[in-house]
């Protein structure tokens, strides 16, 4: 579950919104505005920096209201394992229900965070894609270094498989076998697999 080789889009242009506060207008970036409604958006590679921001947002929402639901929207190719696990552990620590939504794609650590939401509150949009696989890791250095790195990768692999098995209710052996290669699923297939609970179908507009 290493970071993807795909180029990462730059987030240099952050939209701002104008809000009427009753004491005049106030400008804020879109992510801060979403946070007011307890919405967190993970739309990039999951790095240490991204994880630190998401963890800080989660802790802030816990302090603000420890019982009210949090909503996490995910459109990510994945990222660093330890970064994703930092977010995962914080999600489990919060105590409140966490709704997760896949929009676009949730791959690798993105898929793990998607399925880590509160059971019954894990969603995907109809055209989203979900992918699971085993952690990647290049090894190098002395023979001792290689042995230690290989051992760490195996430990992470076992830990991630256990998390996924617990979240999906799939047998551990099936998770291990399916994720030996990139294993892609549609939203409906992800529901059948147990990664999510519902496929969100937009309501048709009536005229």
Curated annotation (Swiss-Prot):
Which is an annotated GO molecular function term of this record?
Answer: serine-type endopeptidase activity
A GO biological process of this protein is:
protein quality control for misfolded or incompletely synthesized proteins
Where would you find this protein in the cell?
A: Cytoplasm
UniProtKB keywords: Cytoplasm, Hydrolase, Protease, Serine protease
Record bears the keyword Magnesium: no
Reactions performed catalytically: Hydrolysis of proteins to small peptides in the presence of ATP and magnesium. alpha-casein is the usual test substrate. In the absence of ATP, only oligopeptides shorter than five residues are hydrolyzed (such as succinyl-Leu-Tyr-|-NHMec, and Leu-Tyr-Leu-|-Tyr-Trp, in which cleavage of the -Tyr-|-Leu- and -Tyr-|-Trp bonds also occurs)
Pfam families xrefs? CLP_protease
Give the EC number(s) listed in the UniProt record.
3.4.21.92
Q: Does the keyword Hydrolase apply?
A: yes
Catalytic residues (UniProt): 108, 133
Q: Domain of life here?
A: Bacteria
Family matches, as CDD domains: S14_ClpP_2 (cd07017)
Q: Which family does it belong to?
A: Belongs to the peptidase S14 family.
Per its database record, what is this protein's job?
Cleaves peptides in various proteins in a process that requires ATP hydrolysis. Has a chymotrypsin-like activity. Plays a major role in the degradation of misfolded proteins.
Q: Which NCBIfam families match?
A: PRK00277.1, PRK12553.1
Quaternary structure, from the entry: Fourteen ClpP subunits assemble into 2 heptameric rings which stack back to back to give a disk-like structure with a central cavity, resembling the structure of eukaryotic proteasomes.
Question: Which named protein is this?
Answer: ATP-dependent Clp protease proteolytic subunit 2
**Source organism of this protein record:** Protochlamydia amoebophila (strain UWE25)
